[in-house]
Swiss-Prot record:
Annotated GO biological process: proton motive force-driven ATP synthesis; proton transmembrane transport
Organism encoding this protein: Sus scrofa
Main location: mitochondrion
Reactions listed under catalytic activity: H(+)(in) = H(+)(out)
Official protein name in the record: ATP synthase F(0) complex subunit C1, mitochondrial
Additional observations: There are three genes which encode the ATP synthase proteolipid and they specify precursors with different import sequences but identical mature proteins.
Pfam families for the chain: ATP-synt_C
FT transit peptide: 1-61
Modified residues (N6,N6,N6-trimethyllysine): K104
The organism's taxonomic lineage, starting at the top: Eukaryota, Metazoa, Chordata, Craniata, Vertebrata
Pathological condition linked to this protein in its record: This protein is the major protein stored in the storage bodies of animals or humans affected with ceroid lipofuscinosis (Batten disease).
Cellular compartments annotated: Mitochondrion membrane
GO molecular function: lipid binding; proton channel activity
Family indicated by similarity: Belongs to the ATPase C chain family.
Listed InterPro entries: ATP_synth_F0_csu (IPR000454), ATP_synth_F0_csu_DDCD_BS (IPR020537), ATP_synth_F0_csu_sf (IPR038662), ATPase_proteolipid_c-like_dom (IPR002379), F/V-ATP_Csub_sf (IPR035921)
Length: 136
């Protein structure tokens, strides 16, 4: 039977070499550099210790940028809906006033309320688009 090199490694050496693998990411980045102890170095062991780093390639950055623009474009569709809603509200105001001029004040107050609701939704959609573009 063949024995592999992994079975011949002492437990202390294995613990010292895999210490970086079991630490949380925040502890790996925020801790101070460790003082070397009297344990044997890991360089003689054929184990490859994985380093936890945030790496972004050009392709992943391009995908993130494209996703930002697609999300912001989808959020601005609501602004067009807001414009259509405001047009509908004031069109209905004109039609209602033409049918019954005595209700001018009540129709106008309802039209202003409808305008405010549609305008708020449009501004909310625009705010979400800007948040997607500049805050993420």
């Amino acid at each position: 039977m063949q024995t592999t090199g992994a079975l011949l490694i002492s437990p202390a050496l294995l613990r010292s070499c895999t210490r970086g693998l079991i630490r949380p990411v925040s502890a790996s980045f925020l801790s101070r550099p460790e003082i070397p102890s009297e344990q044997p170095p890991c360089s003689s062991v054929p184990l490859q210790v994985a380093r936890r780093e945030f790496q972004t390639s050009v392709v992943s950055r391009d995908i993130d940028t494209a996703a930002k623009f697609i999300g912001a474009g989808a959020a601005t569709v609501g602004v067009a809906g807001s414009g259509a809603g405001i047009g509908t509200v004031f069109g209905s105001l004109i039609i209602g006033y033409a049918r019954n001029p005595s209700l001018k004040q009540q129709l106008f107050s309802y039209a202003i309320l409808g305008f405010a609701l549609f305008e708020a939704m449009g501004l909310f959609c625009l705010m979400v688009a800007f948040l997607i573009l500049f805050a993420m």
